[in-house]
């Protein structure tokens, strides 16, 4: 029972972090194209566009901002790239745009911290 409660709490925390990240991105004039984009073997929390840039955004909720960037593991980066490749294949207009892997870090009682180009995209 405790494990189920912990999973529910983590899921709720993740949803709230994504909502905060979306608000922060919208205030920076990003248009949200997708939220919770998932494929087999990959996922992207938010896909956003501003001007000629498409940002594949990973959202991380942490108790503090310390070490938040390190929480994006090489395995997570591969999953983001895999999902981005599939998304790009179904959105050919995006091929001519600048593609970037961003992150938004969310901590309690702090404004979300958006880091552009925090995730190295490797489409090779």
UniProtKB/Swiss-Prot annotation:
GO molecular function: nucleic acid binding
Pfam families named in the record: UPF0102
Membrane-spanning intervals of the chain: none
Family: Belongs to the UPF0102 family.
UniProt name for this protein: UPF0102 protein Msil_0293
Highest classification ranks of the organism: Bacteria, Pseudomonadati, Pseudomonadota, Alphaproteobacteria, Hyphomicrobiales
